[in-house]
Every structure is written in C-alpha cells, then in structure tokens.
C-alpha cells in the first residue's frame, strides 16, 4: 500500500503556524513539474504563502527533482523506517546566489531554518 503526502521539517512548521492563525510563508526551490507544482498547491491549500517559491527549470537544476523521503510504517516490535532521497534535488542544485536574500527576508520578523537541508545546497555558504 503506497500513500503519497507532502511534508518535511520546515514545511511542517509553516503548516502548524498557519493552523494556529500565524501568517506563514514558505520558501524553497522545487522543480517546475507536476510534483513541484502539486507541493506548492498543497501548501497554499493549507494557508501557507508560497509567493517567493522558485519553480526551477531543467536548465537551472539539471536533475530537476523534488527531494523525497519514504516512510515504512513499523508494525509490532518492528520500528518505522525513513529513507531520505534529497541528493541532487532542485533545492540542492539551484544557484542560491541568484536569490536576493535581503529582499526575500524584508518584512519578516522570524526566519526558521532547521535540520541539515540548507547544508545540502551546493551554494550553502551564501546562507
């Protein structure tokens, strides 16, 4: 049985805040394909603003992938297992030097980064 849904640490925080009535905006780079667009639609349907979201082209991110993770739910004494597949995703391959971070963050009171996701980006030193 296979079930697909969207999530991830930073997206989950934005969703939780939006559900509490806090104005939340999510920034990332996703491929400009049905998977990337679906992820953006799902966030927007849950009241998360995605205006600064970058839909990358194959020229900008040659692998043109959405980072994924797979959860195999445990049963009984067998624990659940998570497999991450983020390498060469649109986010990690996009040239973040193209992003005006000052303009992107203008007007926001809080910035939430978590986990290792920003470190996967090839242009992470910009962050």
Map each language-model feature to its residues.
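Residue-level marker of alpha-helix boundaries and capping positions
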Residues: 4, 29-30, 121, 125
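Gly/Ser/Thr-rich beta-alpha loop segments that engage phosphate groups in nucleotides
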Residues: 9-10, 117
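Short secondary-structure boundary/capping segments within folded domains
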Residues: 4, 16-19, 73
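Conserved beta-alpha-beta core of the PfkB/ribokinase-like small-molecule kinase fold
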Residues: 110-127
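Alpha-helix C-terminal capping segments
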Residues: 12-23, 45
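Short pre-catalytic strand/loop immediately N-terminal to key active-site residues, enriched for Gly-Thr
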Residues: 1-7
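Conserved N-terminal subdomain of the carbohydrate kinase-like
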Residues: 23-115
């Amino acid at each position: 049985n296979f079930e697909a849904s969207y999530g991830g640490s930073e997206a989950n925080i934005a969703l939780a805040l939006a559900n509490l009535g806090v104005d939340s905006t999510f920034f990332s780079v996703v491929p400009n394909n049905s998977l990337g667009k679906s992820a953006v639609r799902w966030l927007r349907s849950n009241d998360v603003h995605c205006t600064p979201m970058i839909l990358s082209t194959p020229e900008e991110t040659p692998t043109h992938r959405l980072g994924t993770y797979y959860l195999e739910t445990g049963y009984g004494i067998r624990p659940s297992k998570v497999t991450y597949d983020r390498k060469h995703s649109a986010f990690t391959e996009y040239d973040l030097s193209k992003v005006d971070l000052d303009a992107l963050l203008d007007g926001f009171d809080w910035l939430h980064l978590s986990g290792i996701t920003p470190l996967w980006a090839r242009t992470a030193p910009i962050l």
